[in-house]
């Protein structure tokens, strides 16, 4: 639901599949992503996660137990495949798909395609008859037809080989950069290892981030560090961010410290605040904790700082960067809103906050992606937290304030008295005192609640006092099927090919094409969407 550029294809899956109903197609397409690449690059993202691209079942059907109050469903989300070798015509043509990828690559950005290996769409039993398991046999997460969706017998070597061939063809033929892998816990580990091996044969730097529902750094079904997934989506982080902005700073820092120690380039998680499967961060605060909209907006700003300065792969859900948020109130899912680009303005504090933070993260990729994390000043009662992030001789001090008033804090630093430091977030400068502390003002949460301090290193040219960032790489965002400033670091470069990419990349969840969502509670009961 990101951007509708080619309106002529909106009803390509049937005249009754497009409309205002939240469970129909809303128009997002490949051409729409291409049209908004400059917006995404300006925001500071480097990887665009789009929903499944393959042809899905046409028309509409009541699939949710025939309940009268459930809207009709079209395969707008992309998870009801009918042909894994063809593009979904409601998303665009082959040429539009190629153009989207090539134009993204010109900007040093990557395209991450959502894929489904577990199942096909409703009504495709005859199409895939020789590939499906017996519906009458149900054995746990793997050997069962989740939500009645035709389930592939992936433990069969021939079936596995065909599925792997279908998925890797998008790499070989079109240059897709990454996969987001759906329903990881519902497929056997042998299949995931086979897919990983095949993608590596095509492109050694290819990465896969898995959706293993409920996964975190400590529990992920052994999918990480085992030759299956390069990363998993981090389902723990949202709860931790909520706890942080609620005042439980010390307990969250214990979690983040352990997480920071566990993550490495072959064992990575992608932290998100909102998604198509979850309530939006702001909406959840307003609904569950009864925050006002202003209070929720302020808290979301600090949560974004926590997310974008933490180790791992930040995943930004489309519209989150301009303040949009909704509930995963199945079957209506207000979290599956249409993108509103009119909110991306200089006056939008949330939008400017994201651009600022992404620019800083991009300029100090190694520090944030690999660096140590140490608490240097913190108080649950007073609502502030300052941590040092250090790597390769560079140290940044990240300060966050969850209160509605600015906070004066003396930050202990490992710098000599008299050293000048700069707040990368605001541009303010400070001097290290004789006690080796820096007295800083962390703004109120409503004003961003953030400071990021760095040493101002003297150079031969007195006009150049800012430290040179050790690496610059873009960041990322994900799109959804409807649709739906200027990045401070304008450096453009080809997509990195290093194996370390798994640590440096930032995926942003803007469900740009087809919409992919379902509530967490519903997820356990049914898999109608993903």
Language-model regions: role of each:
Residues 1-4, 54-57, 117-122, 184-187, ...:
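Solvent-exposed loop/turn segments at secondary-structure junctions
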Residues 1-174, 194-210, 217-220, 243:
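Substrate-binding/active-site clefts of carbohydrate-active enzymes
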Residues 40, 50, 84, 104, ...:
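Conserved, mostly hydrophobic/aromatic
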Residues 165-179, 183-272, 286-289, 295-297, ...:
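Active-site-proximal helices and loops of the catalytic beta/alpha 8
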Residues 438-440:
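Short strand-edge motifs at loop-to-beta-strand transitions and within beta-strands
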Residues 460-501:
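C-terminal low-complexity, Ser/Thr- and acidic/Pro-rich disordered "stalk" regions positioned immediately N-terminal
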Residues 503-526:
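A cross-kingdom C-terminal cell-surface attachment/processing module
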Residues 528-530:
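Cytoplasmic C-terminal tails of single-pass
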């Amino acid at each position: 639901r990101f951007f509708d550029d080619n309106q002529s294809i909106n009803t390509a899956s049937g005249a009754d599949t497009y409309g205002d109903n939240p469970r129909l197609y809303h128009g997002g397409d490949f051409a729409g992503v291409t049209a908004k690449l400059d917006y995404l690059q300006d925001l500071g993202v480097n990887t665009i996660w789009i929903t499944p691209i393959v042809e899905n079942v046409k028309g509409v059907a009541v699939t949710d137990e025939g309940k009268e109050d459930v809207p009709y469903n079209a395969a707008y989300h992309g998870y009801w495949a009918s042909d894994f070798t063809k593009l979904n015509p409601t998303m665009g043509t082959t040429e539009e798909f190629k153009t989207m990828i090539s134009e993204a690559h010109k900007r040093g950005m990557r395209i991450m395609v959502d894929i489904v290996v577990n199942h096909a769409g409703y009504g495709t039993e005859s199409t895939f008859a020789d590939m499906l398991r017996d519906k009458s046999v149900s054995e746990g997460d793997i050997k069962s037809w989740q939500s009645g969706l035709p389930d592939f017998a992936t433990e069969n070597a021939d079936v596995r080989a065909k599925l792997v061939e279908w998925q890797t063809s998008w790499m070989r033929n079109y240059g897709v950069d990454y996969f987001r892998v759906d329903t990881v816990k519902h497929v056997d580990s042998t299949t995931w290892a086979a897919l990983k091996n095949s993608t590596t044969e095509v492109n050694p730097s290819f990465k896969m981030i898995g959706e293993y529902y409920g996964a975190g750094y400590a529990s992920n079904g052994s999918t990480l560090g085992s030759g299956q997934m390069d990363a998993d989506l981090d389902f723990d982080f949202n709860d931790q961010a909520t706890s942080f902005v609620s005042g439980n700073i010390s307990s969250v820092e214990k979690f983040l410290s352990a997480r920071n120690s566990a993550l490495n380039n072959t064992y990575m998680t992608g932290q998100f605040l909102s998604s198509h499967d979850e309530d939006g961060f702001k909406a959840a605060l307003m609904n569950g904790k009864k925050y006002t909209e202003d209070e929720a907006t302020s808290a979301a700003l600090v949560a974004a700082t926590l997310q974008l300065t933490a180790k791992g792969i930040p995943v930004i859900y489309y519209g989150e960067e301009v303040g949009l948020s909704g509930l995963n109130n199945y079957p209506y899912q207000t979290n599956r809103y249409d993108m509103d680009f009119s909110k991306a303005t200089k006056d939008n504090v949330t939008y400017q906050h994201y651009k600022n933070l992404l620019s800083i993260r991009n300029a100090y990729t190694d520090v944030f992606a690999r660096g140590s994390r140490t608490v240097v000043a913190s108080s649950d009662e007073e609502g502030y937290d300052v941590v040092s992030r250090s790597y390769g001789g560079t140290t940044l001090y990240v300060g966050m304030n969850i209160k509605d008033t600015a906070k004066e804090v003396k930050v202990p630093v490992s710098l000599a008295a008299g050293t000048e430091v700069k707040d990368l977030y605001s541009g303010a400068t400070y001097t290290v005192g004789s006690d080796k502390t820096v007295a800083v003002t962390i703004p109120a949460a409503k004003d961003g609640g953030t400071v990021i301090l760095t040493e101002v290193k003297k150079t031969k040219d007195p006009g150049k006092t800012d430290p040179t960032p050790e690496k610059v790489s873009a960041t990322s965002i994900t799109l959804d099927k409807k649709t739906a400033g200027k990045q401070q670091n304008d450096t453009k470069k080809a997509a990195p090919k290093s194996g370390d990419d798994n640590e440096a990349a930032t995926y942003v969840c803007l469900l740009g094409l087809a919409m992919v969502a379902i509530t967490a509670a519903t997820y356990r009961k049914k898999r109608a969407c993903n």
